[in-house]
Amino acid sequence: MDSILFWLVPVASVLALCFAYYFHKQMMKESEGTPQMIKIAAAVRKGAMSYLKQQYKIVGCVFLGLVILFSIMAYGFHVQNVWVPIAFLTGGFFSGLSGFLGMKTATYASARTANAARNSLNSGLRIAFRSGAVMGLVVVGLGLLDISFWYLLLNAVIPADALTPTHKLCVITTTMLTFGMGASTQALFARVGGGIYTKAADVGADLVGKVEAGIPEDDPRNPATIADNVGDNVGDVAGMGADLYESYCGSILATAALGAAAFIHSADTVMQFKAVIAPMLIAAVGILLSIIGIFSVRTKENATVKDLLGSLAFGTNLSSVLIVAATFLILWLLQLDNWIWISCAVVVGLLVGIVIGRSTEYYTSQSYRPTQKLSESGKTGPATVIISGIGLGMLSTAIPVIAVVVGIIASFLLASGFDFSNVGMGLYGIGIAAVGMLSTLGITLATDAYGPIADNAGGNAEMAGLGAEVRKRTDALDSLGNTTAATGKGFAIGSAALTGLALLASYIEEIRIGLTRLGTVDLSMPNGDVVSTANATFVDFMNYYDVTLMNPKVLSGMFLGSMMAFLFCGLTMNAVGRAAGHMVDEVRRQFREIKGILTGEAEPDYERCVAISTKGAQREMVIPSLIAILAPIATGLIFGVTGVLGLLIGGLSTGFVLAIFMANAGGAWDNAKKYVEEGNFGGKGGEVHKATVVGDTVGDPFKDTSGPSLNILIKLMSMVAIVMAGLTVAWSLF
């Protein structure tokens, strides 16, 4: 029965890809509209594909170098699993492929969404949302397909005769974890590079176009407007997709490894197998129910932003309610130990995700008081807008942090049978909560990818000179997109926190494998006891490595981890500043030298701005990304396992809170500007509007570059630590 249930995993992944193809074909049948709309969409598509081509060249070089390094470690020094180089490549390939397919769909969907909005609001919403669903379903489909492929392959090729049955599953799951580093590395380049690109273009377009020249957003007279629209795709579609692909795979793989570890001492291999496949089955059922939720999203004509939010919320909530019922059914069919309470841990994960999403919506949507007050602060100039936005961002961290803390404790206690000493099952519960939060990713990512599609549709309508009624509809879709994008960032950050914690626990399992590979059969405890490495518990490893707050290596690692979050943000913020500076200079040059741009008599050189953003993003993304990869390796070689654990704890705790602050402050600044543009506090062109545009410009790298990139930093450092565990155990200095 259990083996039969497992086949639901590859079947669900293939079904997700089939529906993604169906939604893509349906979208492509729609008309792109007028010749001008087609021309604009083609320019955006060309710029986006040109950027991805350049990015993948650089990422390919980095991957080649890392594969050579992993091959030397695996086949030369034997401190790493022999499957790591290949697993690393497949993780990166599928992550990149999901971003490419999602972005290609988004660039074809924007003009079709704008054209559909000429007929009705519901038509525009349907095309934009179902095109976003292509991204969501491709991510979960490819992710789960990769996981099921590797499980079946490793189960067939890893010999059972050299291992006890329970140890074989531990080796399989820890080996599978390593392809997560490929996904993480690709995701970091996609997020950082895409974030730098989109914000360099956005800041350049806003500062010179809106503030200096006084022309509206997406005005065809602005030379940076095509680059700005390209940026929405490379940052918020390809970047977000790679980010959540990594979280999705990471949470499932980490939980499977923790499930194998929880039953490593048991003679019951059947129960261990059930614990390993449970997170995969929950994810598989989540795919099926996400598809149902996607089909349920529709709205009425003349809907307000709240009505549109309600439409998307209905689809997401429907999927969430159904996944709760389905989880209880699946785990009952599995007859997993303590299945009722483990099912409740899935509910905890979903609730944490909902709380974080609603909290983000409250603090960033112009429908609520915090953002409205932020708009009002513009009466006294841009300085108070920036001060108020920073304060709002800091206050907004409270609810998500408390929600995650409650989620960690609740899921730990539920899975462990309310026994804090049952660490193995407790950590498995935290992993299950992370899987629960991401189980409806098919539809939640659809709402995220919808945002940039709607934004591009609005830009297309503005540049093509469509009527006021069409602009009103695309503005409504765009305004909703800003909120769903902000909510999506909060969701991504929350999932990164739980996934990061599950990966942190999985690191100990990788240390066990590393010690075994080096021939360390027994562990000598500080109290004189000797424990078999193969049978050591999490607590035994903590005692063996003296992982306590009074250990200077742990403290040093924690400080370094906290520093990494700020160092990384500083590097990415400065990168945006430098790239935006080049863009500002170019836009000013074109206004100055190309006569007739502002009167509409001459067309700007859009391609030059696209090339500047592309070049700037490629140049600036390498250093932050390499530092994120090298930090865990250097810490491990100097301070050993203890220092790495401190680094991961410090990076997780500080990075999580800092990411929420930056994402919410940036989202609030963006929507404060939108609230003024709706006609409040003097409307467009007034002094309050100019002040909120400055706030929005400051917030751009907060919410679209540094904040979201921290999610990946948290997970990538854990993944690098896991992959390099053998190196740390073998060659650490202290």
Swiss-Prot record:
It catalyses: Na(+)(in) + diphosphate + H2O = Na(+)(out) + 2 phosphate + H(+). Keywords: Calcium, Cell inner membrane, Cell membrane, Ion transport, Magnesium, Membrane, Metal-binding, Potassium, Sodium, Sodium transport, Translocase, Transmembrane, Transmembrane helix, Transport. One of its GO terms (biological process) is sodium ion transport. Mg(2+) 1 binds at residues 202, 206. Its EC number is 7.2.3.1. It is found in: Cell inner membrane. Requires K(+) for maximal activity. Ca(2+) binds at residues 670, 696, 700. Homodimer. This is Putative K(+)-stimulated pyrophosphate-energized sodium pump.
